């Protein structure tokens, strides 16, 4: 059965590839048990301690060892030499299951040249063996046990309800709107009162400064009204003096010169 195969055949192997090169390359896939180089055939057999090492190594077919791209495939008919018993005992605890995607990422980080589809094959391998789904299932199981999602949702809803309750009890939103509206109306009224008093605008210099300050606070409406009043001044000097508002008396420029 292919699932029990621990050896792979490396074809198209460069004559310059050494045993060290081969071992370094395949050590990312798993613990290498033995390497059998067939120099006359430009190939080699690599045997791993675990079947997963061989399965992961096949995903690296098309990568380069030394200066040449190689072909890697399972070797079910190859009989590896028996490993020393002492070596097996000493290294048995070091075998770990690792994701193929991690293997590919590590090799790329080390500068190995891999096949263009190595990453895709590694992801498919992990999904097939349930590495990704197992991790996702673990998170879902934990979420189900402690109810994290429900707690976060409930917490958010509670905060929103509290905010609404405070707003309804104290009418924060409506009161804020009312304050802005009242302030806007007050400034507008003050601007209108000054602007209607044309005598003050024409006869007293400090009134112009006061008007500018009020008009600026009132906004564009006050500014447009001011321009309209100033435009009408030259054509109606007599009317402004004859029809004075109740409570006002004429002020002549001569009075200012005496002072």
From Swiss-Prot:
Q: Which residues form the RRM domain?
A: 6-77
Under the heading InterPro entries, the entry gives: Nucleotide-bd_a/b_plait_sf, RBD_domain_sf, RRM_dom
Please state what is observed when this gene is inactivated: No visible phenotype.
Q: Which residue stretches does the UniProt record annotate as biased composition, category Low complexity? A: 232-243
Tell me the Gene3D superfamilies matching this sequence: 3.30.70.330
- UniProt keywords, alphabetically: Cytoplasm, Membrane, RNA-binding
Region feature Disordered, mapped onto this chain:
219-259
Q: What Pfam families does its record include?
A: RRM_1
Tell me a GO cellular component: plastid
**GO BP term, pick one:** defense response to fungus
Which residues does UniProt assign to the signal peptide?
A: none
**Molecular function via GO:** RNA binding
Question: Quick one: where is this thing mainly located?
Answer: cytoplasm
State its location(s): Cytoplasm; Membrane
The UniProt subunit note reads as follows: Interacts with ACD11, PR1F2 and PR1F3.
Protein's name in the database: Binding partner of ACD11 1
Species source reads Arabidopsis thaliana
Q: Supply the gene name.
A: BPA1
């Amino acid at each position: 059965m292919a699932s029990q195969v621990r050896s792979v055949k490396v074809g198209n192997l460069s004559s310059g590839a050494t045993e060290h090169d081969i071992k370094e390359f395949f050590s990312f896939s798993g613990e290498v048990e033995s390497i059998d180089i067939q120099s006359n055939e430009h190939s080699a057999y690599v045997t791993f301690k675990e079947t997963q090492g061989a399965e992961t190594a096949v995903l690296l077919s098309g990568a380069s060892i030394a200066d040449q791209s190689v072909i890697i495939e399972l070797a079910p008919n190859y009989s590896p030499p028996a490993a020393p018993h002492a070596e097996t005992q000493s290294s048995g605890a070091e075998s770990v299951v690792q994701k193929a995607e991690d293997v590919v990422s590590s090799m790329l980080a080390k500068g190995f040249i891999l096949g263009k589809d190595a990453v895709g094959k590694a992801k498919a391998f992990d999904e097939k063996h349930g590495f990704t789904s197992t991790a996702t299932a673990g998170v879902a199981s934990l979420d189900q046990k402690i109810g994290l999602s429900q707690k976060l949702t409930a917490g958010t809803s509670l905060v929103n309800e509290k905010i609404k309750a405070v707003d309804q009890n104290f009418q924060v939103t409506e009161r804020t709107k009312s304050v802005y509206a009242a302030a806007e109306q007050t400034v507008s009224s003050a601007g209108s009162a000054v602007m209607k008093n044309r005598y003050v605008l024409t006869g007293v210099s400090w009134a112009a400064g006061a008007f500018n300050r009020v008009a600026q606070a009132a906004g564009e409406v006050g500014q447009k009204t001011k321009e309209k009043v100033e435009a009408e001044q030259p054509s109606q000097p007599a009317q402004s003096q004859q029809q004075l508002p109740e409570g006002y008396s004429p002020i002549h420029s001569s009075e200012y010169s005496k002072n």
